[in-house]
From Swiss-Prot:
InterPro entries (alphabetical): MYG1_exonuclease
Domain of life per record: Bacteria
Name of this chain's protein: MYG1 protein CT_386
Species of the source: Chlamydia trachomatis serovar D (strain ATCC VR-885 / DSM 19411 / UW-3/Cx)
Signal sequence, start to end: none
Chain segments annotated as coiled-coil in the UniProt record: none
Lineage per the UniProt record: Bacteria, Pseudomonadati, Chlamydiota, Chlamydiia, Chlamydiales
Length: 289
């Protein structure tokens, strides 16, 4: 007889794929954390409603998600299998599925299946989960597994919150793109850059974006593409590079000048008025107005 809301996974050293798979099932209220069974005993696994990363079977109908058997020829690990399962059940929209997959789960699949290895100096999510394992192999790893599980749940929760926030921002960005040509003006800080390019920003004429931040205003150059995000379509004047306060005031002739990044892609102003003045100055120098 199966234990409702239970999930079985292998014991011993753990990896990001089964940790992520369990975290996803918990997040969507399909299993209980206190009903995670870590074992390789087939009889105990048979009692679990879900089984991840062990058991030699992949069947969404029977809620079995293992990828190690020869009969499975796909590219997923147990994490990708469970994410796809949740999508199929309607827990995730297509957009949210793509977001979670592209942001986290695909990387877990790639690393677990040996198709990706982190370069020196870089630490992936899978690397972090691996570090949660005990330093010495052998013995009980349940305590460390649950530490890693809670970390994964927290990260996935934050990613879902960010996805929802980004979708709200996307609507605002779309509205501003429809009415502005040279500069996208926002009345608050928001996630504009990725949304701008996902909405066709590469062909949009805007070269700048402005928005308030704390008690100041940001004027930033827009990149030509998302992949070239540290470049800008129109840079600030070279003589502004790296200047602060009075130095920038003297260089620009604008009393509200605070800072210009040495990369000439971002500047800070004390008010919306001084920010607009800076924008107009740059546009005049570029003979765009």
């Amino acid at each position: 007889m199966q234990i409702p809301r239970s999930v079985g996974t292998h014991d011993g050293s753990f990896h990001a794929d089964e940790v992520t798979a369990c975290a996803l099932l918990i997040m969507f209220d399909l299993v209980d954390e206190n009903k995670i069974v870590r074992t390789r005993d087939p009889q105990k696994l048979a009692q679990c409603e879900y089984v991840c990363d062990v058991g030699g079977r992949y069947s969404t109908e029977h809620k079995r998600f293992d990828h190690h058997q020869v009969s499975y020829t796909g590219s997923w690990s147990s994490a990708g299998m469970v994410l796809d399962y949740l999508h199929g059940l309607g827990f995730l929209s297509h957009d949210e599925y793509e977001y979670l997959n592209n942001t986290l789960v695909h990387g877990v699949d790639e690393q677990d299946n040996g198709r990706f290895f982190s370069k020196e100096g870089f630490c992936s999510f899978s690397d972090i989960i691996k570090i949660y394992n005990p330093l010495e192999e052998g013995g009980n790893t349940d305590k460390e597994f649950f530490f890693a599980l809670r970390f994964a749940i927290d990260l996935l929760t934050r990613l879902r919150e960010k996805f929802c926030y980004d979708r709200v921002c996307r609507d605002i960005v779309k509205q501003v793109m429809e009415k502005e040509s040279v500069c996208l003006r926002f009345d608050r800080p928001l996630a504009w850059q990725e949304n701008f390019f996902s909405l066709g920003g590469e062909s949009h004429p805007a070269a700048f974006v402005s928005f308030p931040c704390s008690d100041q205003w940001i004027l930033r150059g827009i990149p030509p593409t998302l992949d070239r995000r540290m470049e800008v379509r129109i840079p600030f004047p070279e003589e502004w590079a790296g200047l602060l306060g009075d130095q920038l005031v003297q260089a620009t002739g604008i009393p509200g000048a605070i800072f210009c990044h040495k990369g000439l892609f971002l500047s800070v102003w004390d008010s919306q008025e001084s920010c607009e003045e800076a924008l107009n100055l740059v546009l005049k120098q570029q003979r765009l107005v």
